[in-house]
Each structure stands twice: as structure tokens, then as C-alpha cells.
Amino acid sequence: MKLTCVLVVLLLVLPFGDLIGVCSTPEGSCVHNGCICQNAPCCHPSGCNWVNVCPGFLWDRS
């Protein structure tokens, strides 16, 4: 039973791997306010997360 629970949790968490800083898609570009990304993930790999939001200090590099 415990193994089943662990497997279910892993299946739920794996699609959101970028929550822990794992970016699997190419860098995106941020809107110029430095917050919401136009493409996933955010403009800087350390800023990517599953809702495609950059912290305010990770500004658009362009």
C-alpha cells in the first residue's frame, strides 16, 4: 500500500518537476515587467516554475 501511495505521488509530482528548478523546455521570454512569462519556462532558468512566473528580480534579458 505504501508503495502504491509513493508511486501515485511521484506521478503527480513529475509533471511539475520545474517546481524544484528542473527546466525541460527551452528558455522563454518574459514580459517586460519581469513577472509573467510569454513562453515556458521563465527568461532565466533559476526563475522557472510551474505557473510560468518569474520573480520580479529576473528581468527580461532582451
Curated annotation (Swiss-Prot):
Belongs to the conotoxin O1 superfamily. Probable neurotoxin. Contains 4 disulfide bonds. The keyword Disulfide bond applies. Keywords: Disulfide bond, Neurotoxin, Secreted, Signal, Toxin. It comes from Californiconus californicus. The cysteine framework is XII (C-C-C-C-CC-C-C). One of its GO terms (cellular component) is extracellular region. One of its GO terms (molecular function) is toxin activity. The keyword Flavoprotein does not apply. This is Conotoxin Cal12.2e.
